[in-house]
């Protein structure tokens, strides 16, 4: 079985992390019947610097034709310190989510009793923690309109969700809750 992997190293520590992740996949490949073909593509600040776009069309094509995306990191201090930047590395991640319909951020939170003593938090708070957080990623504050009124007296940052966006993340969360004794 051959799987095509889009490798989006991104920025900062991304290239270093992706190099090591590919080593892990190569070990898996040697010990299994799965083979991986890697296609590198630009995203974030590296894409802005080379193509003028944080999620260029050729990256979209590679992502769309891949079985999976291996994503490094995104962001660059050059853009963090420029509040007037018209285009930002993070825009590439947001555009990728929208383009590929990656709408769910699923974060399991679990403590292991054998590790509780190493935490700075109280044992009674940590014991038996086991829940999952679901967050919708293609609507809301990330994609809302931002601005300042013409007279400069008001600022706005809208948070809008479509009914369909709320329904699909809710459906996903409710189905997971059914598998977890109705606990998320």
Residue ranges and their predicted role:
Residues 1-12, 30, 35-37, 45-184:
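Anion-binding alpha/beta catalytic cores of soluble intermediary-metabolism enzymes, centered on
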Residues 13-18:
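Short N-terminal binding/cap micro-motifs at the start of the first secondary-structure element
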Residues 22-32:
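Short catalytic helix/loop segments, enriched in acidic residues and glycine
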Residues 19-22, 75:
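Short, function-defining helix-loop hinge/capping sites that tune catalysis or transport
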């Amino acid at each position: 079985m051959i799987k095509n992997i889009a490798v989006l190293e991104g920025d900062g520590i991304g290239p270093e992390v992706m190099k090591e992740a590919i080593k892990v996949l190569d070990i898996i490949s040697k010990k299994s019947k799965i083979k991986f073909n890697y296609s590198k593509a630009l995203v974030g600040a590296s894409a802005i610097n080379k193509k003028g776009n944080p999620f260029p069309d050729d990256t979209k094509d590679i992502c769309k034709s891949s079985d999976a995306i291996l994503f490094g990191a995104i962001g660059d201090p050059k853009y963090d310190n420029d509040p007037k930047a018209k285009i930002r590395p993070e825009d590439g991640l947001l555009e990728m989510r929208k383009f590929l319909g990656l709408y769910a951020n699923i974060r399991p939170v679990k403590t292991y009793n054998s590790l509780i003593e190493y935490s700075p938090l109280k044992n009674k708070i940590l014991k038996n923690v086991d829940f999952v957080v679901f967050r919708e990623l293609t609507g809301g504050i990330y994609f809302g309109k931002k601005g300042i009124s013409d007279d400069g007296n008001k600022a706005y940052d809208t948070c809008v969700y479509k009914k369909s966006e709320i329904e699909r993340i809710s459906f996903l969360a409710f189905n997971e809750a059914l598998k977890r004794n109705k606990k998320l």
